[in-house]
């Protein structure tokens, strides 16, 4: 598959290519199925798959064959034998279709149940109420009132004739209600709780194990889930089957009973699981086949029905003959499959929080959890539902792993782009990113790369020959003339005539055109080179029958399909290549236009004005909030000493503000809370802000006997103007009264209803459910918060009708939020200890409410769990306002970071133009003095590049990686001349004379060290000296060198530079900023001096400042190594 680079976004391109791929794949599926139906025993799977690969491209469209195939898949009229099925008319509740085994299963008379009436007969038109006891019939009829009838599954019903219990599993189909009936085994305790409540109890251990995983490894997550499903279901083999971008599948994780051949690492063609089957998995997320050898049961329909009854949603739907043969060939007699459905792309996560739940994001099938058994096996519906719930929890964690992988991937690509950009800006030639380290092969995963530049070719590793590169470039200019780039996983499929000559080792290619003649290529080998068989070695004497569908044959077919294909190029890889393409184009262009410089100046000016005003407003607002807030707010400095303690904190603890200031925070909290506060303080000082942390604060004076104050706290790192963390602010909420109320509930003492419905504002919003999942409590505070009255939500399903991801009273943001709520409530019902969890929902008016939710079990006098109580904690208006101000401050910082990024990028372009101009001048007829000036410009350019690289770092500190040193040979004369040149214009404006009393021996001395950093240091101190010199004054530079021998040919040089200037000297405030990193009023000049001092200390030196009558002197010291030769010798 190949594509020229479009103008649309990555997600748009992804959706378009996905739709095209599904259409093409569905056509292939239909052709395979038709061939199978027509061929019978002569069907040759391997040859047919290979023929599809080598044949002409399929015609995408709704051909008669495809439509017939889809109808055959979705409208089969057969069911499996482990239950029976009825289709009911919703208005009359009469039977309009039934399976042939339904009369026997539902109406057979049992001698253990005496009856004077004739047994009911089951047929078309029978009213279903006549078949079951009154309680069961009523429960079935109740399901009609639900928009989503599956909420009540399974419904426990009892036959009138036999008294046998059945699970009734209800779902809606076109024009009717389809009910599956599965008998309850005598050894099985029948499920009475609705839906997820009963299922969670079965899957609680497995869910807890998954929830406890630290994250960061998809492999660990998949291995854990297959192990838990293996223990939960008892199947012989459990696999995590992952779909790749091109729809082919891979056994990503596996566990088996001893003695089975492993399938781990096998890859299967996309046709092994047809697109129609994947669509059904999206609708019906659990699929069980009990016995692939059992005879299917026919479904009898009423005559002249105006519609076809679809069994797509039925758990009893019979599998198709092709799949049954595949199962038997691999000796898998029974199977259970759960769909793993995830978000289609990460961008939707950010958008969806701004929209009501009804506008659901797109989903995709990530893969399947597949269970196989070597003998017939039946899993009761409650356990299947538990497996489905477990798969939903697993999908939530898969989404999280995707997000984490995306962040790490973007960080890695950004780092590589920055390094390549710096290399380009230093040399202004694409050759540097081919011959240097890192190079273009480090940007994206590939097996080889090449650069075609100026008619010449540079090759890296597994790349075509020089003549083949020229041939590919000619083909691109002829066939893809208008595109700026190209990506393909198969040069053969893309139509390149020389693909066969390249062989299997070069199949995929990505291209970035710098201009019409200069091109960068990336190459990939065939996919089979990346695939490794993860199971047992194949016995060479065991010849595969190509007509016998089997996992090993599927693997072989897959290798044939991808023989001339590479791994596909992902959207993020192409975005990285496109970014490098833009950088290359900008670097190689001439000097930027003056308009861009003017735009940069304007944006910098606007940023300074807007940023300063916004920062002042935020600071004033924060101070006012802290003093007047009705929530406790406390602050500490970097040493943990209290420097903020508002009136609310003093009121709650009895400790006055004056008494609290200056005390260490750990002395003010209860001993049990010391580790919690220590951790919170440590992380906040590192810039990692924790939220919703609970700890207890001691009480003093008149409050001493009241016991500790319980606070739930958000930590906010306090930063200075230069973004250094200088302290921590704690915005808290008093939870003492809240805890007393909760304690009263958990003890189940007295009349709790009097508390629930108390209008006292101290009573938080509370709702509850009984052990069956029906909403049983909804207090006045909850009505005020949601807009829904008590009588509108009572006796509704809490999970599904009151709270759900769609069509509920209080819609949740997405399916992941619903799964998290299910886990929390069911954990409490299972008797587990739960912690507060972030929670959000849309109220009646559509406003999104963010809060904390805690769930607590409700017990009767005998200690049995009879339900769950849930407490909602919503932040006060003051706390919400404080968080908004904090968010505004963070947005201001983010704007500045983005501005820095823009400035860095925008500055580099004119610098590249200047570099180009200087290189062009070098090729002209210049005299020696003119060449020296060009050399000075080059040195200043290197200094700017070094400073711009520092902007990529998060902070400037002594331990920061941005203040690094590069060891290289340089001459003092180059450093001094370049540094002095940077202040000459200022000197001319003030009439200041600079004299360099430096001996020639010093100027010609060749040394090892970081000459660019030394140049930066010298220029900074020269600038300060000139700035604070009087008009008409002078600045003098002198030096002293001391050599210390540390070997025969190696000496250490102790360098001392003195910069003396006239006048009153540098202000004391500015000098303090040079020595004090945490100075809150640090100026630009102060920061420059601070950085220069840090650089000197990295060179084992320092700076001193002497002030005499009318004269001030900076004394700079550093340690360097002497080079073996000197210039001119």
From Swiss-Prot:
Region described as Disordered: 1-24
GTP-binding among keywords: no
SUPFAM superfamilies: ATPase domain of HSP90 chaperone/DNA topoisomerase II/histidine kinase, GAF domain-like, PYP-like sensor domain (PAS domain)
Binding, phytochromobilin: 322
PTM field: Contains one covalently linked phytochromobilin chromophore.
Residue ranges of every copy of the Histidine kinase domain listed in the record: 902-1122
GO molecular function: phosphorelay sensor kinase activity; photoreceptor activity; protein homodimerization activity
Domain GAF: 217-402
Compositionally biased residues, Low complexity: 1-21
Disulfide linkage: none
A Pfam family assignment: GAF
Domain PAS span(s) in chain numbering: 618-688, 748-822
PROSITE patterns named in the record: HIS_KIN, PAS, PHYTOCHROME_1, PHYTOCHROME_2
InterPro entries per UniProt: GAF, GAF-like_dom_sf, HATPase_C_sf, His_kinase_dom, HisK_dim/P_dom, PAS, PAS-like_dom_sf, PAS_2
One of the protein's GO biological processes: regulation of DNA-templated transcription
Keywords: Chromophore, Photoreceptor protein, Receptor, Repeat, Sensory transduction, Transcription, Transcription regulation
SMART domains with a match to the protein in the record: GAF (SM00065), HATPase_c (SM00387), HisKA (SM00388), PAS (SM00091)
Quaternary data: Homodimer.
Function (record text): Regulatory photoreceptor which exists in two forms that are reversibly interconvertible by light: the Pr form that absorbs maximally in the red region of the spectrum and the Pfr form that absorbs maximally in the far-red region. Photoconversion of Pr to Pfr induces an array of morphogenic responses, whereas reconversion of Pfr to Pr cancels the induction of those responses. Pfr controls the expression of a number of nuclear genes including those encoding the small subunit of ribulose-bisphosphate carboxylase, chlorophyll A/B binding protein, protochlorophyllide reductase, rRNA, etc.
Similarity section: Belongs to the phytochrome family.
Protein name per UniProt: Phytochrome A type 4
